UniProtKB/Swiss-Prot annotation:
UniProt GO BP: leucyl-tRNA aminoacylation
Any GO molecular function: aminoacyl-tRNA deacylase activity
Keywords of this entry: Aminoacyl-tRNA synthetase, ATP-binding, Cytoplasm, Ligase, Nucleotide-binding, Protein biosynthesis
Species the sequence originates in: Pseudomonas aeruginosa (strain ATCC 15692 / DSM 22644 / CIP 104116 / JCM 14847 / LMG 12228 / 1C / PRS 101 / PAO1)
Name of protein: Leucine--tRNA ligase
Amino acid sequence: MHEQYQPLEIETQAQNYWKEHQSFLVRELPDKEKFYCLSMFPYPSGKLHMGHVRNYTIGDVISRYHRMQGRNVLQPMGWDAFGMPAENAAMKNNVAPAAWTYDNIAYMKSQLDSLGLAIDWSREVTTCKPDYYRWEQWLFTRLFEKGVIYRKNGTVNWDPVDQTVLANEQVIDGRGWRSGALIEKREIPMYYFKITAYAEELLESLDNLPGWPEQVKTMQRNWIGKSRGMEIGFPYDQASIGHAGQLKVFTTRPDTLMGATYVAVAAEHPLATQAAQNDPQLQAFIDECKRGGVAEADIATQEKKGMATSLFVEHPLTGDKLPVWVANYVLMNYGEGAVMAVPGHDERDFEFANKYGLPIRQVIAKVEGDNDFESSVWKEWYGAKDESVLTVNSGKYDNLGYQAAFDAIGADLEAKGLGQARTQFRLRDWGISRQRYWGCPIPIIHCEACGDVPVPADQLPVVLPEDVVPDGSGSPLAKMPEFYECNCPKCGQPAKRETDTMDTFVESSWYFARYACPQFEGGMLDRKAADYWLPVDQYIGGIEHAILHLLYARFFHKLMRDEGLVGSDEPFKNLLTQGMVVADTYYRTTANGGKDWFNPADVEVERDAKAKVVGARLKSDGQPVEIGGTEKMSKSKNNGVDPQSMIDQYGADTCRLFMMFASPPDMSLEWSDAGVEGANRFLRRVWRLAHAHVSAGLPGALDVAALSDAQKQVRRAIHLAIRQASQDVGQHHKFNTAIAAVMTLMNVLEKAPNQDAQDRALIQEGLETVVLLLAPITPHICHVLWGQLGHAEAVIDARWPSVDESALVQDTLQLVVQVNGKLRGHIDVAASASREDVEAAARANENVLRFTEGLSIRKVIVVPGKLVNIVAN
């Protein structure tokens, strides 16, 4: 055993052992309890960043801990390999996305191996390979035949120069990110998953996920957005519109209907089109609206704009004429593309009405307190629907609470055939068509005679050609007759293959299930294997995936269940959302007002006498730089730390230990070079103590019955550490406090006497405990030390230590003694001492006598096992 800790040598030795013994290869063992631990798989961008390292280390610690509990543990890994970055890199480097992707996968896989992750690589999936997406296409055809997938026109961002559809994030200030052209909104045929058919179940089954963070469940509930309201028909004013009809709106606030003063429609609404026919200004405004973003988030933040039309509708209860406006905040795909506006009691309508001088009518009043209604200043209570408000200025509906007004107005609308109660969801159907090359081909053939025909199962997969280098102008597949020319599977006539590809969220919506049976060729899933492993017991990933990915994966799991592929209702039993990795930022402002960012490694920090940071200089020129505070590690802020350089310098175990010790997993982790140094120092201490112990020769067995009082205290420290770490790792995932418990134990072991066989046997038990408790966190050093401590089997196959409760029992206790709440001393008493004995010992304490001299003792408070407080005056 080397005297010095040599991480590179140790880590190579451990990793070679795991590889040779296929330590992480698992099979279904029906008689053994399983544990499926999964970290969200990475996009193969080129190299790992610290966020990846944190995510995968957390998963690895949990996996290894459960293996030490005797469970059959699956921890797989794969690659979310389709997507736009590969196309962008391909255009930049003039290389096919496939080649770029596979090169990145090879490099990132070697990085994951260097971290020492307990991954079963025999189950690796790569989503851009036909053996994976073939089954996605198969499910698509099944769902298309059942009507769960359908085709309809959808609004997209169209770049007229590049002749392509852009994602919302590729539209910057209304222009294409590459071409700079003004973006148009276009209607094109797209495929949709009918996720709304599962909205109720997706909402209700959140209640069956106690192992999910409440924050994530709330975000999903809000996204699904179930609301009870009414669909109300506003009859057309035939004089202005020219024919009969109704403008249908959905509202959750029919109680405020008497306050409606106008209606607003989307730019694409038929009434907007009609009104613009003889109004060039309105047409120009509609065109401007169509150039705006199509995402709800864009619409929420953009300036609210509108324009009046010459059209009117009638108020369904009063018959009053209400003007029809076109507004940029109304979505055509929400309800029927129209909203009723009640400016008095909706903040968005209130701002809009004030901007354009539209009437604001109060129909709700606060019962008490500040109940003045001002039409120029919005107050929170205007939008209330609780017991603090009642209806006013509403004729026969006056003095009613929210529910009573809802019911009364609703009943009258239903009687007139102008309204019906409805439950609506904010959730929209999921459009998955992408006019891109690097994605899974949609398995549909368009035939003039037969319509849209799914590709038959025996003709799947529809293989994406991998030798294409996109140039950014339109979809490459649409320019490849060899790809799209085909015959109709139904009638045999010449037909055209669909050239759109699927949203990459589709691949990540079912990968967790394919890990159960990645080589299975008899179907999408092997039901037996899927039912053994699923649901995932612990899923780990960033909070940024709280809505889309996690919602789509839950949806897909239910689709697969209804297809008979899995037996469970939910994919992920427990969810851990890890925090970000943040680091200091430094910059200089450039002449044009921009910022040049400098990596923390290139900056020297200046501190005052109290070690507070007072300035920073660039090492290369010695000149000052601005301190930008701590932010998420990113390329844009140049504050990332390359994991590979850390592993090369300190070893993977140091990286892993720092990551787990610096912060609880669900909180942000602040990168600190000093913290990494500290983690490395601690591992060197463990190695040093073990080396000294092993060099002296391994001791015989410990005789627990013959321990001295001092030795009992050492053994108690060992078992306190086991108890603490078992709770922290196994129950709470508080790895930082588990590590702190091991550090406390190390302090005890380093000071423990080393005189006789009992002392050495006790240090042996202590070191074995340190190694076992650290094994999930720093597996390489523990692999080597376990062997050096005399064990034939590898630590990967060892069991987690159990607490010897008898070791925790104390013959004597040390109690704190206070006088009037202030610490005045300590007393040692027998663990079995009575309250009277404890009080007598406290009163007799030398310090207590000094601080109570001349005072009357009023009472003595004894907290058993902890303290005595003497109250005197």
